């Protein structure tokens, strides 16, 4: 997401949880420093006084990627104990797009009800599912497609997205 936003010339604000850092080290070759270097602004999770914690700070919206079930549940219940959940809460109250790229599977009924509640509040649940019609040749192409589809929800058109061209 950060690479795409940089390509598009869009300012990005990054908040990373401890769990996200563990996921980063397990699933990518990026170091935390390399990740944070991709963002325009980096905020600490505990900094609930950051700019993005206020509705008066203008943003296009927010993407939580990846979004854990824990974070999703906190957002759904209005728990704002970290900057991540506070910024998401502000995004909802200001009626800006909030895209949650929930990646846990399978879902149980509680997860689905939480997703329903969030959708009713205005959030968009967008699991990072591969678009096989795009015939991805690598994991990176699958990731880029999911990122691009999420950016579409903000009216941002990223060139890495392969668009559906109909059956051939």
Label the model's feature ranges.
Residues 1-99, 103-168:
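A cross-family phosphate/adenosyl-ligand binding-site feature
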């Amino acid at each position: 997401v950060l690479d795409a936003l940089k390509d598009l010339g869009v300012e990005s604000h990054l908040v990373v949880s401890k769990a996200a850092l563990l996921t980063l080290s397990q699933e990518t070759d990026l170091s935390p420093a390399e990740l944070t270097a991709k963002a325009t602004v980096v905020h600490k999770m505990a900094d609930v006084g950051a700019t993005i914690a206020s509705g008066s700070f203008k943003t296009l919206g927010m993407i939580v990627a990846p979004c854990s079930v824990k974070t999703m549940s906190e957002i759904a219940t209005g728990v704002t104990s970290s900057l991540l959940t506070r910024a998401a809460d502000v995004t909802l109250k200001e009626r800006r797009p909030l895209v949650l790229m929930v990646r846990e599977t399978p879902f149980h009924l509680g997860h689905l009800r939480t997703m329903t509640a969030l959708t009713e509040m205005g959030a968009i649940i967008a699991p990072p599912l591969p678009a096989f019609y795009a015939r991805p040749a690598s994991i990176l192409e699958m990731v880029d497609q999911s990122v691009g589809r999420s950016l579409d929800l903000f009216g941002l058109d990223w060139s890495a997205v392969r668009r559906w061209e109909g059956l051939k």
